[in-house]
Design a protein with these regions (language model features):
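Membrane-embedded alpha-helical bundles of multi-pass transporters/translocases
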Residues: 1-239
């Protein structure tokens, strides 16, 4: 999308520029909404791969889940930064990134002085998600003042559809996780690294099938866009 947006910006074709930008935002949202849900549901099994004892698994799992809250806004910020770069504007991303870093540093100092040690890392992870969300809002407002609003391009509608699709997928993931034994100490899911990996693959696959199946039923154009891109990429590799 960056190359096409750069070409459209150079040719002053802002309608096409917005079209590529919003298509990119929707495709990124399709992936990041599912990724957020999967990694929150599987936060403890993922943590078990890196942590041995149950208390360490719980602590790391909570951090993973907290970080995932900011994945969607982080993905949007990434795309909007590319939009500014396509407009040959590197100053604005510097400004809104500086604001994000300032919020994070200030908040980290406050949390470090006030939070209990057991919740410090989780609270900093939540702070990161919050600061990135603020960064995303500022980036959008700055981009809106530069190229105009993005109304009529269906970003909000698509995001709402992804959220509706991921809710049943999340419930399916939780049910499969519970069927495998849940996340209590000594359960099959958290017993060993290999069982955590197997459980993660089972839960993730169930959530992926449910999510993509619902998007297919919704006739999501973003799903077709992703399929087209994957087909083109693998088609080139096979030649």
């Amino acid at each position: 999308y960056f190359t096409r947006m750069s070409q459209h910006a150079a040719n002053k074709e802002m309608v096409k520029f917005k079209g590529d930008l919003t298509t990119g935002l929707k495709v990124i949202a399709l992936v990041s909404v599912l990724s957020t849900s999967v990694l929150i549901v599987l936060s403890y099994p993922v943590a078990r791969v890196f942590a041995g004892e149950y208390p360490a698994t719980v602590a790391l799992g909570n951090v993973v889940a907290a970080f995932m809250i900011g994945l969607v806004p982080f993905s949007f910020v990434y795309m909007m930064q590319r939009a500014f770069f396509a407009l040959e504007d590197t100053r604005t991303p510097f400004y809104f990134t500086t604001i994000q870093i300032s919020i994070h540093i200030t908040g980290s100092l406050i949390l470090g002085a006030t939070m209990d040690k057991q919740w410090l890392v989780v609270s900093i992870a939540l702070l990161t998600a919050f600061s990135v969300s603020v960064q995303g809002l500022i980036a959008y407002l700055a981009l809106k003042s530069r190229i105009g609003g993005l109304q009529g391009y269906g970003v909000g509608k698509s995001l709402g559809g992804f959220v509706l699709a991921v809710i049943p997928a999340t419930l399916v993931g939780i049910l499969v996780l519970q069927w495998l034994g849940g996340i209590s100490e000594g359960s099959f899911v958290l017993d060993r690294v290999v069982t955590s990996v197997i459980s993660g693959m089972a839960v993730g696959s169930a959530m992926l099938v449910t999510y993509l199946g619902l998007l297919w039923l919704f006739k999501s154009p973003e799903l077709r866009e992703v399929s087209k891109q994957l087909g083109a990429r693998f088609g080139r590799k096979s030649k």
